[in-house]
Amino acid sequence: MNTKKMLAVLVSVAMCGAAFAGCGNNADSSKAESKAESSSSQVEKMPETDEEWTQAMYDKAMVSYGNTSMMQNVIKKAQSGEKVTVAYLGGSITEGISAGADGCYAKLTYDYFAQKFGTGDNVQYVNAGLSGTPSKLGILRLDRDVLAYEPDICFIEFAVNDGTETDYQNAYESIVRTLLQKNITPVLLFSVTENDHSAQDYMKQIGEFYHLPMISYCDALRYLFANNRMTWKDFSDDQSHPNTEGHKLVASMVDYYFDTVMDVAPEGDYVMPTDTVFSPREVDAHMYEGDSLTPTSLGSWKEGSTIASFTNGWTYDNTGDNSPIVFDFKAVSYTHLTLPTN
């Protein structure tokens, strides 16, 4: 079977949803913990059929179910007809570059969740994906772009936009802790680029510490590539963004999580650790724009901006005398976001 056909088979089998997941279900209570390494003395049996390869892909992707009681409670809430909001925070992959707003994994998995667990129009959708943005900007956007909609679930996708330095680690953990403090269920999604860049290692540390659900299409793709089941060009038309079929493949991994999470034994109410992994000093960070912070002096700046979704800031006027814009406020720490206009 060639690689393009393999991708089509993986997607078509995955879209069978619960019918496929119900056969040979591996979602027992042991999967609530991160999967353990196989014994070095035991030879791994390689998949043979297309169905076995698909299941192996899901097993690689499903890093951890975490504390399942959080997601199970949200699912029960949706099934009862109450309003449930599913949010997605990330970069251009989440935004839908290469696949479009309706073809991205976020919209596909929201649709699947709404159809599987919703009772009509009670499940709402928030896509807070923004091209080129890492978790350092994600924590600043979190309040405006996610929390304002009071979500019950928030997927976090920053593995290819983040580096591995401490400021990324602190920001990512700050996002996680802020969501947990507000009783929002985080789901960590790990991506990868053509040159195999992914910041998932430190993100997995955070996910394990907070006992969160983690889905790694990075691990799944590495497994398929290593076994010649598909190539990067089957998955993407550039260096980092899934193409239309790639988004369907990623969505199938998330759908598998939705299909199986109710079968994993719950562990009781979630309790957030008081300790931290890194130094999440940006917890509860807030982004101030022109409607909420007034400068004491504009200097060589003017009100308004036209950069991406940041349209309520200030723009530097290089025809002026180069005098600074001045603000007066109190804060534990602050970050100023400066973007080029061309």
Could you describe each region identified by the protein language model?
Residues 87-89, 95, 99, 135-169:
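Oxyanion-hole/transition-state-stabilizing segment in secreted/luminal serine hydrolases
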Residues 263-328:
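Glycan-recognition and processing domains
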Residues 19-39:
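Sec-dependent signal peptide cleavage junction
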Residues 187-190, 198-235, 248-263:
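Extracellular serine-dependent O-acyl
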Residues 6-24:
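Sec-dependent N-terminal signal peptides of Gram-positive bacterial secreted proteins and lipoproteins
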Residues 47-51, 231-281:
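Histidine-centered active-site loop/cap adjacent to the catalytic His
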Residues 157-161, 170-205, 209:
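Active-site segments of SGNH/GDSL-like serine hydrolases
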Residues 334-341:
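Conserved small/polar residues in nucleotide/adenosyl-binding loops
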